[in-house]
Amino acid sequence: MSRYRGPRVKIIRRLGALPGLTNKTPQLKSNLINQSTSNKKISQYRIRLEEKQKLRFHYGITERQLLNYVRIARKAKGSTGEVLLQLLEMRLDNVIFRLGMTPTIPGARQLVNHRHILVNDYIVDIPSYRCKPQDFITIKNQRKSESIINKNINFYQKYKIPNHLTYNSLEKKGLVNQILDRESIGLKVNELLVVEYYSRQA
């Protein structure tokens, strides 16, 4: 299944706020809640499905990518759900978004694809690149690259940067301080239901 490229407002009306997809936050339709509880068996599946869809649309990944992340998380030490969120949060496109360099993750992905971003002074054009502690993220020293970032950074820096990241506005440099904890996740989601969804699909 490919990435979603349709109307974003339609998605957040159904799933709730997804800041990585869009910064718009329309009101949820109240009748959706009543519909979701009309049948207990269907509603339980739907709840797990919607939690999974939140991750897909927020992080802008395909179904296959998300399944691969779940498989990696299962093999790692610790809580599968928490490891899954850490893997998604440490993607380069998401780190750029959380630093306030772009308004959305699709915007961050475009910067990476167009080779505007450097990690540890090397151009990285793979949005799924997994960042690690002590990685520093900068922009290519070109007028076009800097103008794109500056246009966003002045507005989105008013939002709080999570504790596992630091942004130096003078040097225009982002730093990954550490692996983030659960409280720093920028999305309201029940990751355990996502893990359960995939365990039931196997």
UniProtKB/Swiss-Prot annotation:
Compartments in which it is found: Plastid, Chloroplast
Function: One of the primary rRNA binding proteins, it binds directly to 16S rRNA where it nucleates assembly of the body of the 30S subunit.
Protein name: Small ribosomal subunit protein uS4c
GO annotation terms (biological process): ribosomal small subunit biogenesis; translation
UniProt xrefs under CDD domains: S4
Lipid metabolism in keyword set: no
Keyword entries, A-Z: Chloroplast, Plastid, Ribonucleoprotein, Ribosomal protein, RNA-binding, rRNA-binding
Positions of the S4 RNA-binding domain: 90-152
GO MF term list: rRNA binding; structural constituent of ribosome
GO cellular component terms listed in the entry, alphabetical order: chloroplast; small ribosomal subunit
SUPFAM superfamilies: Alpha-L RNA-binding motif (SSF55174)
Domain of life, source organism: Eukaryota
Gene3D superfamilies: Ribosomal Protein S4 Delta 41, Chain A, domain 1, RNA-binding S4 domain
Oligomer status and interactors: Part of the 30S ribosomal subunit. Contacts protein S5. The interaction surface between S4 and S5 is involved in control of translational fidelity.
Family the UniProt entry places it in: Belongs to the universal ribosomal protein uS4 family.
Residue intervals passing through the bilayer: none
Cross-referenced NCBIfam families: PRK05327.1, rpsD_bact
Recorded name of the encoding gene: rps4
Predominant place of localization: plastid
Organism: Dendrohypopterygium filiculiforme (Moss)
